[in-house]
Regions:
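Bacterial N-terminal signal peptides
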Residues: 8-16
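A contiguous strand-loop segment
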Residues: 23-118, 157, 355
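C-terminus-biased signal that marks the final domain/tail of proteins
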Residues: 20-35, 43, 49, 155-159, ...
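Aromatic- and glycine-enriched pocket-lining scaffold segments that form the walls
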Residues: 140, 144-177
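Structural recognition of the beta-strand scaffold that forms the well-ordered cores
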Residues: 35-37, 100-103, 164-166, 174, ...
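Compact, glycine/acidic-enriched structural inserts
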Residues: 54-67, 110-150, 335-345
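Acidic, His- and aromatic-enriched active-site or binding-groove loops in soluble protein domains
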Residues: 181-193
Length: 355
C-alpha cells in the first residue's frame, strides 16, 4: 500500500513538471565573486517549492521507478537547496564547498539508461542527481569521475532533464544524458534554458551575428535617410517569445552586454534584474483547455553566490529577496529540514506615510 501511495504521489509530481521552463544566467564580479541565477516555471501545476537543509552525515536513498530502493549515499557536504514538488527533488542548490548544481527540463532530446531492477543498488533517479552531486562532491572534476559509478534512470518515461553544475572558480558545465551516455559541455556562454541540446543552442546563436547593443546608425536609401525609430535598434530581431531557443538567445545577449560590477551583492541584484525580463506572466503558458493561473507563470527566481556560499530567492507571491547564508549553519548539528518558500502567499507592501 505504501509503495502504491508513493508511486501515485510521484506520478502527480511528474505531471506537475511536464512543461517546466527555466532560464539560467551566470555573472562574475570584478572582485571574482561568481553568481549563478535562474528562473523556474511549470505550466501544469504548482511546484510546492521548499528550501531544504541537508546536514553532513545524512543518509539518502534514491527513488527508482519501483520505489525508494536506489543507490544509498551519505552526505559528505552540507547543502542548501530549493526543491520542486517534493523535498527530495532539489532542482537548484549549493554546498559548503561552493559547488552548485541544478536541473532544467529537457524533453524529447535526452534519454537515460533503461531501468534494470537488478541494478537498483547503483540506480540514481534523475530528479535526485543535484542532491547526489551536492552532497558528494566539491568540484566538477569529482562529479565527472563519480558519475561513472551510478546509473541515472528516469522516474517517469515522459520527463527528462539536463543539468547545470558550477564551481566558485567560475567554471560551469552542462550535463546532458543521451542514449544513456553522460555528455559534459564546458559552458563558456554562461547561460542555459531547455531543449534542444546545448550544442544546438550554441550553433543557433550564429543566426544572430548581426545583433549588437545600442542603436544602429542612420542609413541613406537614395534620397531618403533611414533612422532608428527608438533606442536599442541594434537588437532589432532579438527573439522575444518564451520558447527555449528564443530565451537562450536573449539571455545570452543580455549576459554578454551586462556591465561587470564591483562585487557580489550588486552582481546578485543585477542577475535578478536581468531575469525580470524572463518572468513569464500568467496566461501565456498553460495546458490546452485549462484556465491560466499562477502555475502558468514564473514561480520563483534564485541567485546563488558560489564564492560566499549564499542562496537568494524571491517568488511570484513575494518579490522580497530572501537570503540563506551557509556560513551561519552548523552542518554537523543542524537537522535535515525543509520549509515552504511561501508559508504565506502574500506580497509585503511598505506603506509610505506622508506628514
Amino acid at each position: 500500500m505504501k509503495k502504491k501511495i508513493l508511486m501515485g504521489t510521484m506520478a502527480i509530481c511528474y505531471g506537475a513538471m511536464q512543461a517546466v521552463a527555466c532560464t539560467g544566467i551566470s555573472l562574475t564580479a570584478k572582485d571574482g565573486s561568481y553568481i549563478q541565477a535562474r528562473t523556474i516555471e511549470a505550466a501544469a501545476g504548482a511546484l510546492k517549492s521548499e528550501y531544504v537543509i541537508i546536514p553532513r552525515g545524512e543518509e539518502i536513498t534514491s527513488f527508482t521507478p519501483s520505489g525508494v530502493n536506489g543507490v544509498t549515499f551519505t552526505a559528505r557536504h552540507g547543502v542548501v537547496g530549493m526543491s520542486v514538488v517534493m523535498k527530495e527533488f532539489i532542482c537548484e542548490g549549493v554546498n559548503e564547498a561552493g559547488l552548485s548544481a541544478g536541473l532544467f527540463f529537457f524533453p524529447h532530446y535526452g534519454s537515460y539508461q533503461s531501468y534494470d531492477k537488478s541494478m537498483n543498488g547503483i540506480s540514481l533517479g534523475d530528479l535526485q542527481v543535484p542532491t547526489w552531486i551536492l552532497t558528494q562532491f566539491a568540484t566538477i572534476d569529482e562529479v565527472k569521475e563519480g558519475i561513472k559509478n551510478v546509473r541515472i534512470v528516469g522516474l517517469d518515461a515522459s520527463s527528462v532533464v539536463h543539468y547545470r553544475i558550477g564551481e566558485p572558480s567560475g567554471r560551469q558545465v552542462v550535463l546532458e544524458i543521451v542514449d544513456g551516455v553522460p555528455h559534459f559541455y564546458e559552458n563558456t556562454v554562461g547561460v542555459l534554458t531547455n531543449a534542444p541540446g546545448f550544442e544546438w543552442h550554441l550553433t543557433n546563436l550564429n543566426n544572430y551575428v548581426n545583433l549588437f547593443p545600442g542603436s544602429a546608425p542612420n542609413q541613406r536609401m537614395g534620397d531618403t535617410t533611414l533612422m532608428p525609430i527608438g533606442g536599442n535598434s541594434g537588437f532589432l530581431g532579438l527573439p522575444g517569445d518564451a520558447t527555449p531557443p528564443s530565451r537562450f538567445v536573449r539571455i545570452a545577449f543580455y549576459r554578454a552586454t551586462a556591465p561587470q560590477l564591483a562585487s557580489a551583492m550588486p552582481t546578485v541584484l543585477q542577475c535578478f534584474h536581468i531575469l525580470n525580463n524572463f518572468d513569464i506572466p500568467i496566461g501565456i503558458e498553460h495546458s490546452l483547455g485549462e484556465a491560466p493561473d499562477i502555475p502558468s507563470a514564473t514561480q520563483w527566481t534564485s541567485a546563488i553566490d558560489l564564492t560566499h556560499r549564499k542562496v537568494y530567492f524571491k517568488t511570484s507571491y513575494n518579490n522580497s529577496i530572501r537570503c540563506i547564508d551557509l556560513a551561519t549553519i552548523d552542518f554537523e548539528k543542524v537537522k535535515y529540514q525543509s520549509h515552504l518558500m511561501d508559508p504565506v502567499k502574500e506580497q509585503p507592501i511598505e506603506q509610505i506615510m506622508i506628514k
